[in-house]
Amino acid sequence: MSQRNRISTDQVETWIFDLDNTLYPVTTRLLAHIDEHMGGFVAKYLGINREEAHQVQKSYFKKYGLTLRGLMIHDGLDPAQYFEEMTPMDLNEVDPNPLLGADIARLKGRKIIYTNASARHAELVLKR
């Protein structure tokens, strides 16, 4: 990249990050853990076995982009209930990364983090 095309990080007003499998490595398997936990939630909420729950979960995800959305539309799920049950997960697989945290903290400007999970989940992951 030529010198004239370079942008100083001081010129960036807003930084946007995706939390899931981006600010922590995919090798943590956190999304796989969430997927399994969600299957248990779907089974319990709908009163079906895990295999049926897995099919419902994947069907809703494919159709709506989020299993939660399908559960809200078809099964009357209150999202607050979903997030309450889905948030208390074991985050020990997410290794602390103080260097990344320090690098992000040094960036000037506003920082936005996106996730499909709850704000509480994001806070817990970011504290790691």
Feature map (PLM): residue ranges:
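Non-catalytic, low-structured ubiquitin/UBL-interacting segments
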Residues: 1
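N-terminal helical cap/lid subdomain that shapes the substrate entry/recognition surface
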Residues: 4-17, 22-99, 109, 119-123
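Conserved phosphate-coupling serine/threonine residues in phosphotransfer and NTP-handling enzymes
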Residues: 115-117
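ABC transporter ATPase nucleotide-binding domain signature
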Residues: 126
